[in-house]
């Protein structure tokens, strides 16, 4: 799995690639947590994700919950790939 962080003002973008599974989920959670600490808005770009399992979905839900617990924070999924959408739906 590849992970890239970009920060532009109050917006932190986490660009994920390839697979989000049991092995990579802790890293995804930590990156989301880091961006929530340093920015107001976190966007998780899933355009390049070809596979996600239940632990990957759980990491995204935990990110959303972390954002909700912090006043003024936002969490968004952007450019969700078809493969990820099939799992979410």
Label each residue range with its predicted role.
Residues 22-89:
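Amphipathic alpha-helical interaction surfaces in cytosolic regulatory modules
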